[in-house]
From Swiss-Prot:
Enzyme active site: 135 (acyl-thioester intermediate)
Keywords in alphabetical order: Aromatic hydrocarbons catabolism, NAD, Oxidoreductase
GO molecular function: acetaldehyde dehydrogenase (acetylating) activity; NAD binding
Matching NCBIfam families: ac_ald_DH_ac, PRK08300.1
Protein name per its UniProtKB record: Acetaldehyde dehydrogenase 1
Amino acid sequence: MATDNTRCKAAIIGSGNIGTDLMIKIMRSGKHLEIAAMVGIDPASDGLARAARLGVATTHEGVEGLARLPVFDEIDFVFDATSAGAHVKNDAFLRALKPGIRMIDLTPAAIGPYCVPVVNLDAHLDAPNVNMVTCGGQATIPMVAAVSRVAKVHYAEIVASISSKSAGPGTRANIDEFTETTSKALEAVGGAGKGKAIIVLNPAEPPLMMRDTVYLLSEAADRALIEASVSEMAAAVQAYVPGYRLKQSVQFDDIPAAAPLHIPGLGRFSGLKTSIFVEVEGAAHYLPAYAGNLDIMTSAALATAERMAASLVNA
């Protein structure tokens, strides 16, 4: 790890699957960040043991323990990979001690603005707290935004299917928050008039890769322009999530005014229906390749923090 002044020091709260994978990613590819501390609440955590073996300062006493570590004074960034409820407390505790600390929130708490790197990171480079939405949000919001920049999207519905094995206790405890946060971000970041999110935990063996289906109802538009926009956006996501890909060609259906669809809460709809199918394969840095849902979260969080850190280092 670098010891010069060209990198910002980061701590990770949450020593589970996401936190450990994020630590490995920062160690392998961090340009403007270095990992300085790993924080957990279970002294027997595999993530804490792994961090200690790699020379990272650790504590099993939560954010209170982090504040007592000698390295805390040097930490500029904190990634929170705990739970929505815990993040609210963690942010308040740490911000009281270090008002300028940057929080990258990987829970559905959404204290700060939603951040999807390829869509709106530039607008939030100075934000003290950014929320990475959810795995389903990171995979599908870029596709909604890709269509939104071509045609007005009235309704977006996404179905995120992930392997049961990749869903740890944190994911399972936040199912309601997942659907609520993702739905809101489909509107706020993706540009949809109304958003709906569904998550499916697939128990199949061997475990399946993350699959996401995006259904969009928009005004009539040039299909070629939509296809080009979607392909361009997918390539932009691949820059930081190499395993992200369109599973098949974009599909279109015309909804004539004479035979409109009825969307609960929206009423009758006619125009263009666009269906986009995405697959996310994990990089297998720490997690298995089928856990693309976790990989896209850690990759998006790292891409966000790296851009923020670069702006601080180069200031």
